[in-house]
Amino acid sequence: LHIDSTLWTRRAVQELIAQQCGVKMPIRTVGEYLRRWGYTPQKPLKRAYEQDPKAVKHWLEYEYPSIKQRRQEECGEIAWGDESGLRSDEHSGRGYAPVGQTPEIHLSHKPRVRVNFIASLSNQGTVRFMLYTCKLTAKVFIIFLERLIRKAERKLFWIVDRHPVHRSESVKQWLAEHKSEIELFPLPSYSPELNPTEYLNCDVKQGVHSKPPTRNLTQLKDRVISHLRKLQKLPARI
């Protein structure tokens, strides 16, 4: 196919029809047919070129089942972890306005503030989190690990990405000293779509950034905490 498009847009389908059938169909008609056939315009998932499909397949078919088997044998709990952050000048979502009158959001020129958080999401929807404003370091990460095991009633099988901090020597040493309470399992590289905590991160950002922008660090923290606590009460949401 000689179509200059990475996605099946109406224009791309129009070109395909012209190539295969010799018919120049109006773009509006193409959209109507796509709608009738059950197709809707969707934002594509992003996957890194560096992702190894074989590694992903092996993880799904062998490594994750092995983790589940061990969890069952040791009466533990599987959870997923990830880090994320929110800036005060970010905004998400759309708002209605008359045609040709794009809505505006007024932002301050004061220095922006940022809040980061680490979250843990169990297979049963249990959410645990910790906020921080500094750069993620092994020390910060270990503080969260200590909080996790302090509140855990069973051994935690925690699945995370391959962030350098997760693989640092101090973290490895700490984990070796607490192996009976928690173990870390790495996801395949460049595979955020395998981590359900990504959905939690998106939910938090959508909820926080749907409110009026703020330049107040305390207010931004309060909004993040409020939304995460709401998710803690809605285990079926994520």
Describe the function of each predicted region.
Residues L1-M25, Q72-E73:
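A short, amphipathic alpha-helix used for macromolecular contacts
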Residues A12, E61-E146:
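Extended, low-complexity cationic-aromatic segments
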Residues P26-G38:
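Major-groove recognition helix of helix-turn-helix-like DNA-binding domains
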Residues T29, E74-I78, T197-I238:
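C-terminal anion-handling pockets and recognition modules
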Residues P41-K57:
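Short Lys/Arg-enriched helix C-cap and helix-to-coil transition segments
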Residues L45, T102-P111, A176-P196, P212-P213:
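RNase H-like polynucleotidyl transferase catalytic core
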Residues D82, E153-R167, N195:
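Acidic/histidine-rich, metal-coordinating catalytic segments
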Residues R114, D161-R162, E169, F185-V208, ...:
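RNase H-like two-metal-ion nuclease catalytic core shared by retroviral integrases
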